[in-house]
C-alpha cells in the first residue's frame, strides 16, 4: 500500500511540477505546464507551452557530437601518410588539363576522402589489424562509428560536387561509387566462397575497384576543362598496374610488410594476382587454397605459401606482366604527348610503380 502511494505521489510530481523547480528556477504563476482547473469535470486541464523554457544554449553537441567526433575515424587515417598515388596522378594529368588550383583542390579532396572512406570499410571487411603501420581505425573507434564515418564521407563529397557547377559531376560520381561496390563485391565473394577467379575476372574486378577512383578523378577534371581527349585506356592501364604491383609487394616486400602487416593478403584469404596465377598453374595441388581457408597469422605457414608461389613462377609472371603493361602505358603517354605536350608527371608515376627484375639495375 505504501509503495503504491509513493509511486502515485512521484508520478504526480513528475507530471505537474514545473521542470525549472528542481533546478532552482522560480516560475511565475502562469509558468506551469499543467494547472489545476476546479471548473473542469476532469479536475485537471492541460495547458502545454504556457511557460517558455529557460533561455540556455542548445546542448545538442553534447549528445550528437560536433563534426570532429563524427569524422574522427577518417581524420585518424588521414593523419597517417600513405603513398598518395591518386594525388600524384591528379597532378600529372593536370599537366595536360591545366585546371586552376581551386578546381583542382575540389577533385583532390573528393578523391582523397572517398579513398580514405573505402579503406575504413575495407579494413573492417578484411578483418585487418594494421593500416600504414598503425592500428586500423575500427580497432580504435569501434566498428559502428567507423562505418558511420565512412558513409558520412561518401555523402559529404557528394555534396561537394555542387562546387563543380556541372550536373554531369553527380552522374560521374554515382557511377564511380557503383563501380567501386561492384568490384568490392566480386572480391568479397571470391574470398568468402573460396572461389578462385580467372585472370580475366580478376582484371575486370580491378577495373571496377582500383580503376574506379582513377577514372572518377580524371572525369571530374575533364568536366571542368575543355578537353575531349579520351584518356580511358591509359587510366585503365594505370589502375591495373597499380593493383598488380600492390598484390606483388604485399607478399614480397619487407618494407611494405612492416607497414601493412606481414603478407596480410594471405591472412585475409585474398585471391590476389600471384595467388590466382599459382593456383591455376598447378590446379591439382590444393595447398595454397587450404592455406587461404585457414586465414592464418602464422608467418611460418605464410612463408611456405610464398615459397610455393615462387616455385610455380607466379612472382616472375607478375614482374613480366607489369613490365608489359608499363610498356603499353608509356606508349599511350607518348601518343598523347604528340597532341597535348610532354607529361613528366605520368612518366614519374610509372617509374614509381616500376618493379625491378632480378639482376636489373635500379632506375636512376
From Swiss-Prot:
InterPro entries: Isoprenoid_synthase_dom_sf, Polyprenyl_synt, Polyprenyl_synt_CS. Geranylgeranyl pyrophosphate synthase; part of the gene cluster that mediates the biosynthesis of the indole diterpenes janthitremanes such as shearinine K or shearinine A. The geranylgeranyl diphosphate (GGPP) synthase janG catalyzes the first step in janthitremane biosynthesis via conversion of farnesyl pyrophosphate and isopentyl pyrophosphate into geranylgeranyl pyrophosphate (GGPP). Condensation of indole-3-glycerol phosphate with GGPP by the prenyl transferase janC then forms 3-geranylgeranylindole (3-GGI). Dimethylallyl diphosphate binds at residues 131, 209-210, 243, 250, 260, 270. It is an enzyme of class 2 (transferase). Mg(2+) 3 binds at residue 246. The record marks 154 as: Important for determining product chain length. Binds 3 Mg(2+) ions per subunit. Pathway: Secondary metabolite biosynthesis. PROSITE patterns: POLYPRENYL_SYNTHASE_1 (PS00723), POLYPRENYL_SYNTHASE_2 (PS00444). Its cofactor is Mg(2+). The lineage of its organism: Eukaryota, Fungi, Dikarya, Ascomycota, Pezizomycotina. Mg(2+) 2 binds at residues 122, 126. This is Geranylgeranyl pyrophosphate synthase janG. It comes from the Eukaryota. Its EC number is 2.5.1.-, 2.5.1.1, 2.5.1.29, 2.5.1.10. GO terms for molecular function: (2E,6E)-farnesyl diphosphate synthase activity; dimethylallyltranstransferase activity; geranylgeranyl diphosphate synthase activity; metal ion binding. GO terms for biological process: alcohol biosynthetic process; isoprenoid biosynthetic process; mycotoxin biosynthetic process. Signal peptide: none annotated. Keywords: Isoprene biosynthesis, Magnesium, Metal-binding, Transferase. Mg(2+) 1 binds at residues 122, 126. Pfam families: polyprenyl_synt. It catalyses: isopentenyl diphosphate + dimethylallyl diphosphate = (2E)-geranyl diphosphate + diphosphate; isopentenyl diphosphate + (2E)-geranyl diphosphate = (2E,6E)-farnesyl diphosphate + diphosphate; isopentenyl diphosphate + (2E,6E)-farnesyl diphosphate = (2E,6E,10E)-geranylgeranyl diphosphate + diphosphate. Isopentenyl diphosphate binds at residues 83, 86, 115, 132. Belongs to the FPP/GGPP synthase family.
Amino acid at each position: 500500500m505504501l509503495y503504491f502511494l509513493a509511486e502515485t505521489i512521484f508520478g504526480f510530481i513528475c507530471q505537474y511540477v514545473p521542470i525549472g523547480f528542481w533546478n532552482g528556477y522560480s516560475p511565475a504563476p502562469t509558468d506551469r505546464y499543467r494547472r489545476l482547473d476546479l471548473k473542469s469535470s476532469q479536475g485537471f486541464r492541460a495547458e502545454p507551452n504556457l511557460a517558455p523554457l529557460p533561455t540556455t544554449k542548445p546542448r545538442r553537441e553534447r549528445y550528437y557530437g560536433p563534426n570532429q567526433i563524427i569524422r574522427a575515424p577518417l581524420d585518424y587515417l588521414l593523419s597517417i601518410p600513405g603513398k598518395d598515388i591518386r594525388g600524384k596522378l591528379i597532378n600529372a594529368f593536370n599537366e595536360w588539363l591545366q585546371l586552376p588550383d581551386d578546381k583542382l583542390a575540389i577533385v583532390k579532396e573528393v578523391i582523397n576522402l572517398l579513398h580514405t572512406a573505402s579503406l575504413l570499410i575495407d579494413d573492417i571487411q578484411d578483418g585487418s589489424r594494421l593500416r600504414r603501420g598503425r592500428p586500423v581505425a575500427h580497432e580504435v573507434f569501434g566498428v559502428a562509428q567507423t562505418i558511420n564515418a565512412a558513409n558520412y564521407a561518401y555523402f559529404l563529397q557528394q555534396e561537394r560536387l555542387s562546387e563543380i557547377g556541372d550536373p554531369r559531376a553527380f552522374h560521374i560520381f554515382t557511377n564511380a561509387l557503383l563501380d567501386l561496390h561492384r568490384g568490392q563485391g566480386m572480391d568479397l565473394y571470391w574470398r568468402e566462397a573460396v572461389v578462385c577467379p580467372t585472370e580475366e575476372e580478376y582484371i575486370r574486378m580491378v577495373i571496377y575497384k582500383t580503376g574506379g577512383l582513377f577514372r572518377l578523378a580524371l572525369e571530374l577534371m575533364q568536366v571542368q576543362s575543355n578537353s575531349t581527349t579520351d584518356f580511358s585506356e591509359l587510366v585503365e592501364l594505370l589502375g591495373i598496374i597499380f593493383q598488380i604491383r600492390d598484390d606483388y609487394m604485399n607478399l614480397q616486400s619487407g618494407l611494405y610488410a612492416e607497414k601493412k602487416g606481414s603478407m596480410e593478403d594471405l591472412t585475409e584469404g585474398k585471391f590476389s594476382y600471384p595467388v590466382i596465377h599459382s593456383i591455376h598453374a598447378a590446379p591439382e595441388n590444393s595447398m595454397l587454397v587450404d592455406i587461404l581457408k585457414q586465414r592464418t597469422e602464422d608467418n611460418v605457414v605464410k612463408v611456405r605459401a610464398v615459397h610455393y608461389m615462387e616455385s610455380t613462377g607466379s612472382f616472375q609472371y607478375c614482374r613480366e606482366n607489369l613490365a608489359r603493361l608499363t610498356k603499353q602505358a608509356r606508349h599511350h603517354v607518348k601518343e598523347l604527348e604528340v597532341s597535348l605536350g610532354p607529361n613528366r608527371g605520368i612518366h614519374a608515376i610509372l617509374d614509381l610503380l616500376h618493379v625491378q627484375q632480378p639482376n636489373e639495375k635500379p632506375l636512376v
